[in-house]
Curated annotation (Swiss-Prot):
Gene: wts
Keywords: ATP-binding, Cytoplasm, Cytoskeleton, Kinase, Magnesium, Metal-binding, Nucleotide-binding, Phosphoprotein, Serine/threonine-protein kinase, Transferase, Tumor suppressor
The protein, known as: Serine/threonine-protein kinase Warts
Residues the record marks as active site: 843
GO process annotations (BP): border follicle cell migration; cell fate specification; G1/S transition of mitotic cell cycle; hippo signaling; imaginal disc growth; intrinsic apoptotic signaling pathway in response to DNA damage by p53 class mediator; negative regulation of canonical Wnt signaling pathway; negative regulation of cell population proliferation
Gene3D superfamilies in the record: Phosphorylase Kinase, domain 1 (3.30.200.20), Transferase(Phosphotransferase) domain 1 (1.10.510.10)
Length: 1105
């Protein structure tokens, strides 16, 4: 026995007590406890004092805890008390004071200046720490603090004094028993000031129990809450590396030496308080509210080990309270501690009021939670949970989790209020529990994590009950999942039904649209067939119109199929839904997706049926249903149709662009010519500069007005019909006057489009318009306006009142040679003017030679004129034409009989060479050249053949190749060498006979290769060709008044009515007019139409502004 272990205050009777006291005395002589001084917070490391005087620093490896002595079974743990050091050792170098802390106990001095023999045996090599709270921070400078700040299961209250002080290094004063060094620092390193004393307990409780004696100030700092520890855990080996920075430092589930000493002394009643045998009652861990009389003690708290191992992740619950630990940043993902936040289940039954109890000797129960109990500041009362003693049959790991409810946050809160709230919550929970048992769980109830009820017994629930509760929770979760799956399936079914309804609605809209399109195609087809039949009846040898330019390739695939019942995609096969316009024609696609079926724009809402088949889509007009339009008048509807955008072939585009560019260039040239002509006239007259400037301004103003007038639309209502002049094969000629210029008369030639198209005269009409528009000389009838409407084409020309040459021939019979010489000379000049413009008239005859009021001639009727342009070629306007078609009179037809045909390049070269030749059979057979009839190619020399035939008719009185039928006439013209005879009774002069022989000859020997060859002939001796129009004509027609038409042949009224344009219905050409492009760029307006210059040559014609 150690000599220091002598008994103080009596020697115990039994052997066990003696051994315990002996061990305690050894501890007191081995360790010296340091105190934290209140003012001086500097920390002094604990050291060993050896016999040889050397002090070894106590490193963290020496902070060991002694294995506690096993108390007797009847002993119970006593509350923490402060044991003052014995008088024999206080103040000595080897003495010290004992401090209960979370770090450990250090020894500064040893009695008698030496280390005890048991020192080596009591210090293990490594500290065995609880593995769940191993941390990375060093623990040598921080002491144990309240578990409310460092434990995951602690309270989340924020009214701790740790958060209100700055950090100051703490220290321990060795040998200072009066210092308040027992106040532990916070985990974050903040220094703490000793808190004030707790509020006074209930006065009713003090009357029933013995009041505790006052605690001396020196030992107030040692008043501590119980530290969580377990004595039934197997020890774990701590890692050899540096410890973590967690402020929670346990003693491997064991008590520190001061706690062991306090518990053992309390169980043996070795330290009576106040010098009497009464036991000193420590301050209770709870705020006692209620008397101490007969109230049953509260049930023991559950096992801390079981609660640590049974914690789950937090989930939403109606009866859960989330208790979060402070975010100190020391818990890592690999920590074995409890997760935070922790679901704490509230017990359904009301809690019993805490009663003061007498600490009796009982079996040792491990303390699982410890917190600082302040004595100076008003702190909330924290909860201390004590783990009950585990039964020997069941292990601690299988115990169910029971966590007590948190106490009120502030001590001022009345216990009655808390009890009422707990009772109300318990009653609501009990009713809800009964309701849940009576009715199946609904899917809206969130899953419960922990056990929602706690049995009203002191013993923990058995393993079977725990497994039953878990099984019930699993079944409830499965039921909820099944109900959620059923709801999802129902929603999917509803969505599918809605999609099917939308698909059916879209299908109905598409069916109605397809039906409308089929009806429209049938109507178009009927109209096309009717027009083709009419055209075939009018001209059986003529080919029909071509089909629309864009055709669809689907003939049998236009059936509308029902859509597949997919969730999101609507597969609808509809050949009519193509892009507009389709270039090239869109092929049928079975996988075409109709994304706009619900927004197609159909407003009729008809529910059409599924179409089994439909006709082939020959023309795509639109991609969406035609909306219903307001009912308007027929005139407005016709006007609207005129501006509808229509599809045309590439030939139409080529035709339009060539004509448009040609007209633009022509307008520029004409404007430049007028400007230069004005400058020439002003320079010739010698006008002053100021006058020249004014003239130029007037010309520019005229040009601007002309451009505006060209854009103005014209119609026949702008003219007033006076009387008819003549009737032709395609229309009529009428004397008219313009409304705004009544002093000028015009001859308006009207051509019906239907007749032009039937007889394939589109190229001729186009050529006549171009010649009359470009001809700006005095030998050609001047064209002022040209325009069109839906049914007719209109030419507004200058009125020539003297009639035509044919009327004069009929009237006179045979011309005198002087009269014939005059008219032949003027005809020669007129033909030369046409040739200079690059045209060939090809229809020179007495009917097309007009005589004006002065007796001079003008050429007209340029319907058969050609300018060697592709727009003047009739083959271009032939229906169903293609690039592979060849002219029947092309030169390589001869090679097909005698040998192989020329190659493609040779044919192209020959075609280019033959471009200057004409191969069409046109004109009157009496006046046409033989090369034209033979289609061997002709040039402008063919017009001089016609001049020779007219001279023959003037002098002889009849055509040279007169016959009973046109076919006989044609044969005579071809065999002209045998059939051309000049009768001697005509008594023609030698010059006239020679000129006829020279003009009516073969093309290689004919006069006319140049106009000078003709003018230099002896027949024209004495004729001044330079001033022909200034000479007085030998014949002046008789004109009684400006509107006199007696010089023309009378018009048959029956013929006139049958050809009246106003009587035509217009249905014959309505469809063709919409699709035909030959009449583009037909409108024309001449410059200076209101002020016409006098008849002058081009060189002398001034520009009137």
């Amino acid at each position: 026995m150690h000599p220091a272990g002598e008994k103080r205050g009596g020697r115990p009777n039994d052997k066990y007590t003696a051994e315990a006291l002996e061990s305690i005395k050894q501890d007191l002589t081995r360790f010296e406890v340091q105190n934290n001084h209140r003012n001086n917070q500097n920390y002094t490391p604990l050291r060993y004092t050896a016999t040889n005087g050397r002090n070894d620093a106590l490193t963290p490896d020496y902070h060991h805890a002694k294995q506690p002595m096993e108390p007797p079974p009847s002993a119970s743990p006593a509350p923490d008390v402060v044991i003052p050091p014995p008088p024999a050792i206080v103040g000595q170098p080897g003495a010290g004071s004992i401090s209960v802390s979370g770090v450990g106990v250090g020894v500064v001095g040893v009695a008698n200046g030496r280390v005890p023999k048991m020192m080596t045996a009591l210090m293990p090599n490594k500290l065995i720490r609880k593995p769940s709270i191993e941390r990375d921070t060093a623990s040598s400078h921080y002491l144990r603090c309240s578990p409310a700040l460092d434990s995951g299961a602690g309270s989340s209250r924020s009214d701790s004094p740790h958060s209100h002080h700055t950090h100051q290094p703490s220290s321990r004063t060795v040998g200072n028993p009066g210092g308040n060094g027992g106040f532990s620092p916070s985990p974050s390193g903040f220094s703490e000031v000793a808190p004030p004393a707790p509020p006074p307990r209930n006065p009713t409780a003090c009357s029933a129990a013995t009041p505790p004696p006052p605690v001396p100030p020196t030992s107030q700092a040692y008043v501590k809450r119980r530290s969580p520890a377990l004595n039934n855990r197997p020890p774990a080996i701590a890692p050899p590396t540096q410890r973590g920075n967690s402020p929670v430092i346990t003693q491997n589930g064991l008590k520190n030496p001061q706690q062991q000493l306090t518990q053992q002394l309390k169980s043996l009643n070795l330290y009576p308080g106040g010098g009497s045998g009464a036991v000193v009652e420590p301050p209770p861990p709870y705020l006692i509210q209620g008397g101490a009389g007969g109230a049953a003690p509260p049930p023991p708290p559950p096992s801390y080990t079981a609660s640590m191992q049974s914690r789950q992740s937090p989930t939403q619950s109606q009866q859960s309270d989330y208790r979060k630990s402070p975010s100190s940043g020391i818990y890592s993902a690999t920590s074995a501690g409890s997760p935070s936040p922790i679901t704490v289940s509230l017990p359904p039954a009301p809690l019993a009021k805490p009663q003061p109890r007498v600490y009796q000797a009982r079996s040792q129960q491990p303390i699982i939670m410890q917190s600082v109990k302040s004595t100076q500041v008003q702190k909330p009362v924290l909860q201390t949970a004590v783990a009950p003693q585990s039964p020997s049959s069941a292990s601690a790991s299988n115990s169910p989790v029971h966590v007590l409810a948190a106490p009120p946050s502030y001590p001022q809160k009345s216990a009655a209020v808390v009890q009422q709230q707990q009772q109300a919550a318990a009653a609501a929970h009990q009713q809800q529990h009964q309701h849940q048992q009576s009715k199946p769980p609904t899917p809206t109830t969130p899953p419960l994590v922990g056990l929602n009820s706690k049995p009203n017994c002191l013993e923990p629930p058995s393993y079977a009950k725990s497994m039953q509760a878990k099984a019930a929770t699993v079944v409830q979760q499965q039921q909820q999942q099944q109900q959620q799956q059923q709801q999802v399936q129902q929603q999917q079914v509803q969505q599918q039904q809605q999609q099917q309804q939308q698909q059916l609605q879209a299908l109905r809209v598409l069916q109605a649209q397809a039906q409308r399109e089929r009806d429209q195609r049938e109507r178009d087809q009927r109209e096309r067939e009717r027009d083709q039949q009419k055209l075939a009846n009018g001209n059986p040898g003529r080919q029909m119109l071509p089909p629309p330019p864009y055709q669809s390739n689907n003939n049998n695939n236009s059936e509308i199929k029902p859509p597949s019942c997919n969730n999101n995609n609507i597969q609808i096969s509809n050949s009519n839904l193509a892009t507009t316009p389709p270039i090239p024609p869109a092929k049928y696609n079975n996988n075409s997706s109709n994304t706009g079926a619900n927004s197609s724009g159909g407003s009729n809402g008809s529910t059409g049926t599924t179409a089994s088949s439909s006709t082939s889509c020959k023309k795509i007009k639109h991609a969406s249903p035609i909306p219903e339009r307001k009912k308007i008048s027929k005139e407005k509807e016709e006007e609207r149709k005129e501006f509808r955008i229509r599809q045309y072939s590439p030939q139409a585009f080529k035709f339009f662009m060539e004509q448009h560019i040609e007209n633009v260039i022509k307008s520029y040239r004409q404007r430049t010519y007028r400007k230069n002509q004005l400058e020439k006239e002003m320079h010739k007259v010698g006008l002053p500069d100021q006058t020249q400037i004014e003239m130029r301004k007037m010309l520019n103003q005229k040009e601007s007005n002309y451009i505006r007038l060209k854009r103005a639309k014209m119609d026949k209502s702008m003219f007033v019909k006076l009387k008819p002049i003549g009737v032709g094969a395609f229309g009529e000629v009428t004397l008219v006057s313009k409304i705004d210029t009544s002093n000028h008369l015009y001859a308006m030639k009207t051509l019906r489009k239907a007749d032009v198209l039937k007889r394939n005269q589109v190229a001729h009409v186009k050529a006549e318009r171009d010649i009359l528009a470009e001809a700006d000389n005095n030998w050609v009838v001047k064209l002022y306006y040209s325009f069109q409407d839906k049914d007719n084409l209109y030419f507004v020309m200058d009125y020539i009142p003297g009639g035509d040459l044919m009327s004069l021939l009929i009237k006179l019979g045979i011309f005198e040679e002087e009269l014939a010489r005059f008219y032949i000379a003027e005809v020669t000049c007129a033909v030369d003017s046409v040739h200079k413009m690059g045209f060939i008239h090809r229809d020179i005859k007495p009917d097309n030679i007009l005589i004006d009021r002065d007796g001079h001639i003008k050429l007209t009727d340029f319907g058969l004129c050609t300018g060697f342009r592709w727009t003047h070629n009739s083959k271009y306007y032939q229906e169903n034409g293609n690039h592979s078609r060849q002219d029947s009179m092309e030169p390589w037809e001869e090679y097909s009989e005698n040998g192989p045909k020329p190659t493609v390049l040779e044919r192209r070269r020959m075609r280019d060479h033959q471009r200057v030749l004409a191969h069409s059979l046109v004109g009157t057979p009496n006046y046409i050249a033989p090369e034209v009839l033979e289609r061997s190619g002709y040039t402008q020399l063919c017009d001089y053949w016609s001049v020779g035939v007219i001279l023959y008719e003037m002098l002889v009185g009849q055509p040279p190749f007169l016959a009973n039928s046109p076919l006989e006439t044609q044969q005579k013209v071809i065999n002209w060498e045998k059939t051309l005879h000049i009768p001697p009774q005509a008594e023609l002069s030698r010059e006239a006979t020679d000129l006829i022989r020279r003009l009516c000859a073969s093309a290689d020997k004919r006069l006319g290769k140049s106009v000078d060859e003709v003018k230099s002939h002896d027949f024209f001796k004495g004729i001044d060709f330079a001033d022909m129009r200034k000479q007085k004509a030998p014949y002046i027609p008789e004109i009684k008044h400006p509107t006199d038409t007696s010089n023309f042949d009378p018009v048959d009224p029956e013929k006139l009515r049958s050809n009246d344009s106003t009587m035509s219905s217009g249905d014959d050409v309505d469809q063709n007019d919409r699709t035909f492009h030959g009449f583009f760029e037909f409108t024309f307006r001449r410059f200076f139409d209101d002020k016409q210059p006098p008849d002058m040559t081009d060189d002398q014609a001034p520009v009137y502004v």
